[in-house]
Curated annotation (Swiss-Prot):
Annotated SUPFAM superfamilies: Photosystem II reaction center protein L, PsbL (SSF161017)
Gene this chain is encoded by: psbL
GO BP terms, alphabetized: photosynthesis
HAMAP family recorded: PSII_PsbL
Role, per record: One of the components of the core complex of photosystem II (PSII). PSII is a light-driven water:plastoquinone oxidoreductase that uses light energy to abstract electrons from H(2)O, generating O(2) and a proton gradient subsequently used for ATP formation. It consists of a core antenna complex that captures photons, and an electron transfer chain that converts photonic excitation into a charge separation. This subunit is found at the monomer-monomer interface and is required for correct PSII assembly and/or dimerization.
Predominant cellular place of this UniProt entry's protein: plastid
Name the UniProt record assigns to this protein: Photosystem II reaction center protein L
Keyword terms, alphabetized: Membrane, Photosynthesis, Photosystem II, Plastid, Reaction center, Transmembrane, Transmembrane helix
Amino acid sequence: MTQQSNPNEQTVELNRTSLYWGLLLIFVLAVLFSNYFFN
């Protein structure tokens, strides 16, 4: 039971971290593109 629950929790954490990194990367790209277009 514990072996099955641990990988599931790890995958959930990886998905959350990857989602946060993706949002941060999109935010940075949006700022860079906005600066490029305004300049």
